[in-house]
Amino acid sequence: MMRTVQLRTLRPCIRAQQQPVRAPTSVAAATATTPAPTKKCPFSLFAKLGGREAVEAAVDKFYNKVVADPTVSVFFSKTDMKVQRSKQFAFLAYALGGAAEWKGKDMRTAHKDLVPHLTDVHFQAVVRHLSDTLAELGVTPGDIADAMAVVASTKTEVLNMPRQQGAESNR
């Protein structure tokens, strides 16, 4: 069963909301449902993971694993990895509470050219690489679980699944 991470779990000092943390389906949705972190809120998962330097290091280590894995490396063969790392950092900063807004594409749009070739097998490989990376960097099991719950909440959009189907398969 997938954990549903409530916004209050990730940002306890910000007024709790009832919606689970989800990757935005649009920029408007992102800004409408996600309050901005403040300097008074050092408890975001982004901060707990070590902030900018730690998350950048995690992104670098994560993509080293991804491009070495034949299961998923094919999706990055024509990708400028410097640009990809920058996009991933920006998304994680937003999703983990370290940035007030996400200015990138929604997850469905960002991954649409990969579908139908992108499957749950690929999604799970990427999740595993991120989880392994965080563990190798000394992140606590609880914080890894919270981060993985945020990542899992993007599955429906990344794989372009009908929203109801994705909600059921994430449980």
From Swiss-Prot:
- Keyword field contains Zinc-finger: no
Instruction: Enumerate the residues binding heme.
Output: 63, 111
Essential cofactor(s): heme
Residue stretch of the organelle transit peptide: 1-23
**Free-text remark on how the cofactor is bound:** Binds 1 heme group per subunit.
NAD is among the record's keywords: no
- Where would you find this protein in the cell? Plastid, Chloroplast
Highest taxon above the source species:
Eukaryota
Induction description: By light.
Please give the Gene Ontology molecular function terms for this protein.
Answer: heme binding; metal ion binding; oxygen binding; oxygen carrier activity
**Gene Ontology cellular component terms for the protein in this record:** chloroplast
InterPro entries per UniProt? Globin-like_sf, Globin/Proto, Globin_bac-like_CS, Hemoglobin_trunc
Q: Which UniProt keywords apply?
A: Chloroplast, Heme, Iron, Metal-binding, Oxygen transport, Plastid, Transit peptide, Transport
State the family it belongs to. Belongs to the truncated hemoglobin family. Group I subfamily.
- Protein name (Swiss-Prot/TrEMBL): Group 1 truncated hemoglobin LI410
The lineage is: Eukaryota, Viridiplantae, Chlorophyta, core chlorophytes, Chlorophyceae
